[in-house]
Amino acid sequence: MLRVLLFLVVLVGAALAAAAFVPLKIVIEFAHLGKIGFTTSGTEGTAWEGRIYDAHLGKIALGDIETHAVPAELLKGRLRIDMTGTDPGTQLSGGFSLGWGGIGIDALNLTASVPGEGPVPSGTVFVEGLTARFPGTYCGTAGGNARAYIPSPLAGVVPAGSMTGPAMCRDGALTFDLASDTGEARQEIEINATGGYSMRATIKPRNALIAAGLSSKGFTPGPDGYVYQTERRL
């Protein structure tokens, strides 16, 4: 029995090691990154070392990306591709992986501009140390943090500033649960496996006049405050 298990371990390790020399384009396709809106004008090299040209995550421009495999992850039954962005504006680093436990995001750091939607103004999102696993098409585990800087007042009520919070899995979706420093506003951003996402902004009005103003901007009353919700694609 021990010999059989050892043989299987060696067999899987050899298969993953061989996978490191598969063309990078095929690895990206196998990881189904296109489903979440990841596109590129071209690639060169293999999973071991390569380059991705003019990458985009939906409407977010990532620029050119240098990639390389992480040998230590092969011993864990996973093929991990680390990425380093060449665009200083995105500060992209981290990677993605596949193998035991499904497809994953590994220690991802990213800065991206996010367009506004209705009463929610545009801003900049800073993702820090995002790690997640997707067994199948749902989010199984997630960790890391996100910070959103909003340069203008949220719904004309909450002062400009930052909202911060953790990354987590909620109802099978990768979720960022952000809150303002004052606690009067929250934003929940849920990203699904097909590249769609929902954004839910909740504001606790301080008085009836503010509540009326929120209603006029599309917010609806709820148990935790006034809520504005929308669904979009990356």
Language-model regions: role of each:
Residues 2-23:
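Hydrophobic membrane-insertion alpha-helices, especially the h-region
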Residues 121-124, 134-141, 194-197:
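Charged, low-complexity intrinsically disordered regions
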